Amino acid sequence: MGSFENVLSSVNEDCRLLCPECSQERKKKNVKTLSVTITENGKVYHCHHCGASGKVPYAGSVIREIKPVRLPPETEPGLVERFLKSRGIEPSKVMSYPVIGGRKFFRGQQDEIEAVGFVYGTPGEITAVKWRGLETKAFTQDGAAQEFYGIHQLPKDVDQLVICEGECDALALNSIGIPAVSVPNGAPQKVSRKQVDPSDDGKYGYVWAARETIEKASRIILATDMDDPGEALAEELARRIGRAKCWRVTFPGKDANDTLLEHGAEALQKAIDEA
């Protein structure tokens, strides 16, 4: 199919494509597993099957302006509270974290469905809203999430920072008083063999964007999921942050939120303390 540069040469908007790395080797050759996000510095790609990721720079000086995301009005009063409680999270403990509720259209759905949106950015500059259906596993995104979720809600003097794989995991930890953030784009399928280059590290640009916060913290807890992609993400984060500063959590559940839901706040606190 050609290189990523060739495949993305004519792309000028966020989309999904066939992955040139793995699509021909799969049984379902026509499934578009390569997500492409247009950023200020290039076209960021990530394959949700083989884990291939990177950034293709723009030819010349052509850069698409990233438009700010407008938040829709709240159309479902109580929906966010209902969702958080269903995940074992006390809403009053995470009120400063931007989560909105409403009805959203997802690909593959016949009509709009109830959904919650995790808001990225600041009140004056919303950069993305990541939506998930309440009753389905449907996901979609408005804008481009390129920073840690919850980074703007952290205490300025945070000494221990927990990094999670999903927004609900970060909310679960914050609800019991543990400062935590979530990566914006999930976990890779495997650890990349590419050398880490901060100037060309599109998928993990959020790590470099939070460098000041990370450097101030004396201890970074990697609280990614208890599966192979979660281990790969923990490894990729440690490569960029520095292994001497990182500790890995072992959860009794699948992740932080499941641990809170199935084992309780004490078990979640214990897992972090014993990292």
Predicted features and spans:
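Short, surface-exposed amphipathic charged segments that create phosphate/polyanion-binding patches used
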Residues: 113-115, 194-201, 255-272
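TOPRIM metal-binding catalytic domain and adjacent DNA-binding surface shared by DnaG-type primases
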Residues: 1-26, 41-43, 48-127, 135-138, ...
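Short, acidic/turn-prone active-site loops that include or flank metal/cofactor-
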Residues: 183-189, 226, 250-253
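Phosphate-handling DNA/RNA-contact segment within nucleic-acid enzymes
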Residues: 105-218, 234
